[in-house]
């Protein structure tokens, strides 16, 4: 598994993986956050294999104009996105940052691929492990944000859904989190 950047670890909706017969045998069903998900998963590929895939618009019905870029770009790594943000900052004279979301951190920890260390290491490598860095880390889970709080000084954002609670089973529910104390 690599520090690749996709919206989900199941990549059939954001890449052309289904068009690669050499990866057909990797299609599988996994339980992610308590629900079965069928497809191809980043954790089953090497970075070199992921780099052979091409990105595509995840929600073409919502963003039809973006489909004109389908197939043009490889899957970026976190390091590549950070470099892109830094280059854009230099070119424009404006601060360009990143807003990574840790997706399914409990799942990744359960399979021996915790996300937090790799994310913080990447930020430290470029001097972005500080409170005023152009970075906000977001997650729908609670436990990994608590862990990140001990590892980094960048701002952490608790995401919430309209109903239910964090996939890591942490209390309180999202509704209770949104209630003033």
Task: Identify the meaning behind each predicted range.
Residues 1-181:
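Phosphate-group recognition and catalysis centered on beta-loop-alpha active-site segments
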